[in-house]
Regions:
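Two-component/phosphorelay signaling modules centered on CheY-like receiver
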Residues: 13-32
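Receiver (REC) domain active-site loop signature in two-component systems and cognate sites
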Residues: 58
Length: 126
């Protein structure tokens, strides 16, 4: 069974738990959680991830800055990124995708939609 390493970046403990719980349905999943973009960058420096899932609106460093920094880092620029933000935050969605995010999931999160997007990305990665 292949192993899939996910980095979940979300400042809300409840949302982090919900996303992580959904990802655990994928066989071989290993989930690491981060509270904000700075915490995520620290974890990226010591671990390898298959997909980053990040909220956009967070304190300290938001998800858009995180997407930009990951895309400009040669060691991590190819890691797929899924941005998660409040439904209707069209400007955030557009900016996130323009910065290099691979996909977008609106809040409130529908588990089936999240898993479909994650599985599509994993299939493309091979």
């Amino acid at each position: 069974m292949p192993e899939h390493n996910f980095l979940v970046v979300e400042d809300s403990p409840t949302m982090r738990q919900l996303i992580s719980f959904a990802l655990k349905r994928i066989p071989g999943s290993k989930i690491v959680e981060a509270n904000d973009g700075i915490d995520a960058l620290k974890k990226l420096s010591t671990q390898k991830f298959d997909i980053i899932l990040t909220d956009i609106n967070m304190p300290i460093m938001d998800g858009l800055k995180l997407v930009s920094m990951v895309r400009n880092d040669p060691a991590h620029k190819t890691i797929p990124i899924i941005i998660i933000t409040t439904e209707g935050a069209e400007e955030d969605r557009k900016r996130g995708l323009a910065l290099g995010a691979n996909a977008y999931v609106p809040k409130p999160i529908q588990t089936a939609d999240l898993l479909n997007i994650v599985n599509q990305i994993l299939e493309k990665k091979g």
